[in-house]
Amino acid sequence: MIIELKSVGKIFPKSQFRLDDISFNIEEGEIVGLIGSNGTGKSTILKMINGLIPYDKGNIYYQGKEVKSFSDNKLRQMRKDIAYIFQNHNLLVGESVYYHLALVYKLNHQKVNHDAINDILDFLGLMDLKQVKCHSLSGGQQQKVASAMAVLQKPKLILCDEISSALDTNSEKEIFNLLSDLREKYGISILMIAHHLSLLKQYCDRVMILDHQTIVDTVVPVKATLNQLESNYVDQVKEFLLHD
């Protein structure tokens, strides 16, 4: 098991929003989707997993060990093992695509693997743009660069926060294919937030549904039977995921 949340909660004192009793786990090599309407706390869950924001109750376990007990060095190592692809990528103005990919190795004090960089550029259709400054790229192309940086990190877990929102249909499928191939080749686990149910249904081993600030159900696409829930949103999502 790569990550586990047990009754995790988050309170925001200056607002009425809170997360309650978030419990789930992700196995090694598993692709898990997280779906929910806007404002239900999907991104907050990812940030708590990666340690970007603290959680107020419950426990998070990484590879079976409680994160709260980690030393600073252990936390740094965990964050190296968890790649986070944000919805709003932060690329350096004035620097090239290739510079950003080489930076992954430099930040980890590793020799730059030019072959690996060229392979990922070719896979994503960015080879002709490798010397182009990132601020000149389209939003979809910039998202591809951010995704490539995560892949080169060779993480144990990738957190994807609506990474396909700025991509056209073909580019979106390329990114999801890349993540799926990465899972198959390296056994990497992936937790992804997305609104395109057809892609979640196609690529995820299971999909968790977040409603009223808690996980209300977990669906194995197509294979499970539909349970009736009170939320119309949840019903509609499950109907789509469970039926061909």
Positions of PLM-derived features:
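The feature captures the beta-strand-to-loop junction immediately N-terminal to the Walker
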Residues: 35-37
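Helix-to-loop junction immediately C-terminal to a conserved catalytic motif
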Residues: 50
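Conserved ABC transporter NBD signature motif
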Residues: 58-66
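Conserved ABC ATPase "signature" region
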Residues: 114-129
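Conserved ABC ATPase signature
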Residues: 133-137
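Catalytic Walker B motif of ABC-type/P-loop ATPase nucleotide-binding domains
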Residues: 158-161
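Conserved beta-strand-loop-alpha-helix hinge in the C-terminal portion
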Residues: 214-238
